[in-house]
Amino acid sequence: MKILFLIFTFQFCLALPFLFPSEDEEHKIRNAMPEKTTVKPAKLHKALIYSHASGFKHSSIPTGAKALRIMAEKTGVFDATFTIKTEEFTKKGLAKYDLIIFNNCTHIQKAF
């Protein structure tokens, strides 16, 4: 059992650099984002950002999430809630949000 744990830990450590955007990628994202919107929204919108992939796990999911986080931060147009869970996908849960963004989701058609 210990050897399996060590193997898993080692594999996870090897994959860690690929789980998050690099500093260079984040810098490029920040530079590409506008500092402000062209039209000021009447209110701060609440966004649910869903990033679950049931099949192939796209390596761009963390980059997309980072870009959306930076966009929310820089523009102030929306407040983002990030999730990979489906608990919010109820009538009551969705009523809290103005918009839903599906970030590289796969194999979710049957769920919705």
Sequence positions of predicted segments:
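N-terminal pre-domain segments of enzymes
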Residues: L16-L44
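Helical hinge/lid and interdomain linker segments adjacent to catalytic or ligand-binding clefts
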Residues: L16-L19, I49-H52, F56-F112
